[in-house]
Structure formats: structure tokens, C-alpha cells
């Protein structure tokens, strides 16, 4: 108990929160890559063993509001320490599983602890009012790199061991990093309590319209992001015949698109610190409408470059909504609003595969999916139109800390 009192109300440099974001996405994808090997151990096929991971992803979203509530009641820094040790110990428990029920329970436990990061870690990040957009962009890149690194790292571990090694190594690393994170916690020089003492206790003017616009862009953007990250590798396999018909090559090209586009978040984050988010969100939406539609029409090299630009606009949207939140929502409410936003994102993401499956099974070609996503991007354009323009005096992230 004394140890947790010692870390309550503290903060940590951005780099450590960014690495935590990397680990959050990485740990959630360990099973995705190790599932086939685990299935062989338990005598199950890939499609059968994958069911063990469903609970983890459901809890990953569903427990976010609970994590936000606990952080508001106790301490964000304490919850973040629990996050690292929790995902680490849960991963080790997964490695010790002797039945698929034990494995499912352990993966569910990973999901529970992994749910802490987005409502709590992001809220810690935006406590500081310095260059919020840019810092959110950098943080987003770390999360994307966690997604990209998981298949590579787990693939290497599988060449020297089995699925148990994948969970053990990942869990031990998370615990070791959790100790580093805890040691790097420092006193918050601008605690939320001091901001509240200056009157920053309510939402900024126009917050209803701003959160409505954020909800529209989150829902439509979440579906587009989920669908694009799922269908692009397969679309490249069938639509780049002049470049390659190799699954390995087209997969590499898809990875290049994702990796390059993810860095757009930094540029958009830098821009949103200087330009009203209304116009940035509007422009990102227009870019998605145009270039996602072009991706449905092109093949080969034209498709590759159109898809690269389209994904830049898709990834570029990520830091915008959290920046909007920091300007309209007081610190005391941010974790709760972030948790709801994250849960909506996951719910929308869960609908991607069934909806895409129904469309393709109905006889439509894959290009029709991109036409659908281009149409959905109109909602992002509309969200940009609805988003109010704030004066500096109205922005909550510009209020004095003391």
C-alpha cells in the first residue's frame, strides 16, 4: 500500500508513455502470431484455437471505462504501473496454460490489463498542454510500430522456441519495463488540481458540437481504418500483377504502405498545433474521400501510390480527435471520455470483418469495399464542417497551470 502511495499523482516523460503504447499493441498480438503453434500443441486447427483470443479483445475494449473510473478514483500513475506488471504476469500465465480454457482465461486477463493504456496513458500524455498534437502523433506511431513489430518478433521467437516462449519472453520484458517505468515517475509540476483551482472545472464552450463531431469522425474513421488495414494486403495480391504476384512481395508492399503512412501522424500532429483542428479534420476527410475512391479504380503502380496517399490520410486522422478532446474536455473527465471513444472504436472495428464478408459474399468485388469506405469518409468531412472554431481563450489546453 505504501508503495502505491509513493507513486500516486506522478507523471513520466513522454518517451516512457510511448513505449508503453508500443507494448500495449504488441502484447495484444502475441497470440495472433503464436496461435498456430499453440493450436498444434492442443490438437486444434488455426480457426479453432483463434476462438481463445476473442475474450481478450472483448475485454480490451469493454474494460476501458472501468480502468478510467479506477484511474479517476485512485491514480493514473498507479494504474499505469499496474498495467505493465499486469500484462506481463498475464502473459506468463498464458505460457503456463495446460488447457485451452486456461489459455483463454489468461488471454482474457491480458485484455483486462491492456485496457488500461488508452484511457489512462493517453490522459497522462495530454495532462501537459505543450504541443499536444505533435506528441499525440509521435505516440500514435509507437502504437503502430507495436502492431508491426509483433509478427516479426514473435516469428523470430517461434524459430528458436514455441508459443510458450513467445508469451514468457514478452511477459518478462513487460515486467522489466514496468520497473523502469516506475523508477522514472516524477512529481507532476502542473497537477490537475492546480488547474481546477484556476476555474478549469467545466467543459469548453461548444463542447457538445465538438464531441458530436468527434463521435462522427471516430465511428466512420474507425471503420475505414479497420477495413483498410485488413483488406489492403489481399487487394494488393489481386491488383498488382505488373509488380508481383508473390504473396511475400505484395505483403511487403502492404507493410511499407502501413509503416510509411503511420509517420503522417507526426506531421498532422505538428500541423494541428498551429492550425485549427476544424480545417485539419476537414482536409483529412476530403483526402480520404478522393484517394480511397481512386484506390478502387487503379491497379499496379498507380494503385500502390494511391493507396499510400490514402493510408496517409487514414493514419493522419488518429491524433486529431484526442487533440480536440484536450481542448474541450477538462482533465477530470478526459479518462472517461477517452475510454468511451476507445470502446466505440473497438465495437466499430469488430463490425468490419462481418460487414466486409457479407459484401463480398453478395457477389461484389473487393473494389466495392473501397467505394463504400470513400462514401463513409464523407462523414469525416461533415464532422470537420460541424466542429467549432475556438479562440485561444476558450481552449482548455491553453489554461494556465498555476
Label every PLM stretch briefly:
Residues 165-182, 368-386:
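Symmetry-related core transmembrane helices of the 12-TM Major Facilitator Superfamily/SLC fold
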Residues 29, 57-65, 147-148, 258-266, ...:
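Residue-level signature of mid-helix packing/kink "hotspots" within the transmembrane helices
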Residues 139-186:
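Helix-loop-helix hairpin linking two adjacent transmembrane segments in secondary transporters
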Residues 275-321:
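C-terminal transmembrane helical hairpin of 12-TM major facilitator-type secondary transporters
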Residues 62-98, 272-275:
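Conserved MFS/SLC helix-loop-helix module at the cytosolic interface between two early adjacent transmembrane helices
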